[in-house]
Amino acid sequence: MKIVILYRSVLKMKYCLIIIVVLLMNVTALYAQDPHFSQFFEAPLLRNPSLAGLFAGDIRIQGVYRNQWGSVTTPYQTGSFNIEYKQPIGKANDFITTGLQILYDRAGTTNFTTTNIYPAVNYHKALNGEKSRYLSLGFMGGYVQKRIDRSKMTTNSQYGPNGYNPALPDGETFTKSSYHYWDGSFGMSYNSSINGSETDNFFIGFAYHHFNRPLNSFYKNPPVELNPKWVASAGVRFTASEVSYITIQGDYSKQGNYTETIAGATYSVKIGDDYQNPLYTLHLGGYLRVKDAFIPFLKLDYRPFSIGFSYDANISQLKTASQGRGGFELSISYAGFLDRGNTTKDAVVCPKF
């Protein structure tokens, strides 16, 4: 009987080790890398602070929630909230956008939790008198806290001759279950209409995150710096018909040895009698995170509100363990005018992704 029990235990441990190895191949970087969203365009400040304010109106509020890997381990949960307010500068065609970005991420059985609070500012410099070309420079920086629930940790120091014993010390040398640091990012973007169109436009931008290289570890020695992250973003929107348009966009990011490429397209259909200012717009699209996931996307605009859904169909090495299931995302946003006296902002024909 003991041999049978031991054999079953070995098989169970072998299966667990396979799962762990596959996970490590895919997610080791998560504790050292930034969380990501498949609906990356619904968290513009996390892409690039200089993308703040690229919308029709003077105020925008956005929220994104992501739930990932519930079929393999404790679900990874990530939430983003941002608010932006845009206003003109003097009598010129320049604008300034101020905002706030909050990011919450919880991962793993130890509830490894990260909370980021970032004020942001973005200056939009008009490059012509028609308000059709802008160069934007943005900055974002603030406070970051990371913490774990140490009572849920399991280490090899807690295994004895009789198996796992939670009463044994975990053997880790850090004394505090949380730490914090200050973080900063900046970016630049260029956006323009296409041939003077008020609906067809494009943008390109570059951002540099964590430029101050904050210390990112529960341990004091050796010190571990958070790798800076470069992000290149681009997008174009063009008319497909009187009632529809297509948006193509993507991001490439590099942080340490980790790189990520995500890109795709959305087909948007205006619904209603007024095609210039439709009450409803339906968006259908698909995105690809290279070597990781295919992402179908659905969004409905009911001005001034929007709600979007996406789902990651896993195509990475984790596909077998996750049974192809990845992450679900829900986004909700509002974009409108807080001050009706600022309606001239709608005349800025820069991209409104």
Positions of predicted regions on the chain:
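Cleavable N-terminal export/targeting peptides
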Residues: 1-34, 337-353
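Subset of outer-membrane beta-barrel
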Residues: 33-353
